[in-house]
Amino acid sequence: MRPIYLDNNATTRVDAEVLQAMLPFFADVFGNASSMHDAGATAGAAINVARRQLQALIGAKFDPEITFTSGGTESNNAAILSGLEAMPERTEIVTSAVEHPAVLTLCTHLEKTRGTKVHKVPVDHQGRLDLDAYQDALTHRVAIVSIMWANNETGTIFPVVKLAEMAKKVGAIFHTDAVQAIGKLPIDLKSTAIDMLSLSAHKFHGPKGVGALYIKRGVPFHALIKGGHQERDRRAGTENTPGIVGLGKAAELALDCMDKDNAIIRSFRDRLEKGLLERVPQVFVMGDPVTRLPNTTSIAFEGVGGEAMQFLLNRHGIACSSGSACTSRSLSTSHVLKAMGTPHRQAVGAVRFSLSGYNCEEDIDRVLRVIPAVVKKLRESRPVFAG
């Protein structure tokens, strides 16, 4: 039985071309990019190629605006902490209630340890940002705004280009966590007011452990990691040359294939949703039905537990993600669904399916055969959750 992987918002398969591009840099071309000899220069040249490949994907005006990091979490932390350090007279952060923990956990830490005031802008029942509340939060006390480009659970896309323009009116630095958007949405940063952007290679068929932080030219930046002078003094530490090369190749492939792949992926996603809505009663699609990522659907199966659903689907060779976190004492829903005001009885049964170009029509057919029976079994064996 061929496994069906529908958890691509968690991580993606490394593309074969990406792997082949990386392999020489593990053994044959292994020089330290900071070294002056030929081996180092060759590694450094490969890193510069990757920088230009990523520049093309995100539409950066200058390739030095790209700083390579270990991934999205580091990039998010570096951006927010730098924003506060660059504007010490400002002591407030604006973010959303549905950000990734890489942002929200840091904000909570800053509240407790520094007394930083954090404005968590609410969302509506479809996960869309409350623009009036966002406008109200923007004052000259705000150092940095950090709003995700697209939500990892629901796929809802935020109007970050507009949000950045609003932030500029009060002189705040604007950062976006674009980890879920890169490779799925066309991005042209040079035409926006966005100051910083985070991304991670493993979300678009690159390797794990490598990412980047875009820092617009002229935006003040204070390095999170101190040490050597790598990445123009913005990120100390010997560069992960194989990973960076892989990121660059993945960026090149994403730029070449995005439009074609997205059309196919969206059609499969829509077919999956339509099939489940027709075959299974008491099913609800979460998030914005239109303005969302082409590969993502978050579906609530009322009367079942998302974790139990995930477990049984895994036994059928189907990998997906639950929107709930189950412990021996309680069943809690995701902070995203809570922020959306999703009824508890629906939120605990939420399952996220996130597709990629590696999925096929047969995958969708099999999922549509399996899920109705799984839901029926769970509903017969477990009480409907009270909300």
UniProtKB/Swiss-Prot annotation:
Entry EC number(s): 2.8.1.7
Residues carrying N6-(pyridoxal phosphate)lysine: K203
Catalytic activity as recorded in UniProt: (sulfur carrier)-H + L-cysteine = (sulfur carrier)-SH + L-alanine
Cofactors demanded by this protein: pyridoxal 5'-phosphate
Any GO MF annotation of the entry: iron-sulfur cluster binding
Chain segments annotated as coiled-coil in the UniProt record: none
Matching InterPro entries: Aminotrans_V_dom, Aminotrans_V_PyrdxlP_BS, Cys_deSase_NifS_bac/arc, Cysteine_dSase, PyrdxlP-dep_Trfase, PyrdxlP-dep_Trfase_major, PyrdxlP-dep_Trfase_small
Domain of life: Bacteria
The keyword Metal-binding belongs to this UniProt entry's keyword annotation: yes
Record: residues binding [2Fe-2S] cluster: C326
Binding site for pyridoxal 5'-phosphate: G72, T73, N152, Q180, S200, A201, H202, T238
GO BP of this protein: amino acid metabolic process; nitrogen fixation
Keywords assigned: Iron, Iron-sulfur, Metal-binding, Nitrogen fixation, Plasmid, Pyridoxal phosphate, Transferase
Family matches, as Pfam families: Aminotran_5
NCBIfam families according to UniProt: FeS_nifS (TIGR03402)
Assigned protein family: Belongs to the class-V pyridoxal-phosphate-dependent aminotransferase family. NifS/IscS subfamily.
Subunit and partners: Homodimer.
Function, as annotated: Catalyzes the removal of elemental sulfur atoms from cysteine to produce alanine. Seems to participate in the biosynthesis of the nitrogenase metalloclusters by providing the inorganic sulfur required for the Fe-S core formation.
Name listed for the protein in its UniProt record: Cysteine desulfurase
Organism the protein comes from: Sinorhizobium fredii (strain NBRC 101917 / NGR234)
Gene: nifS
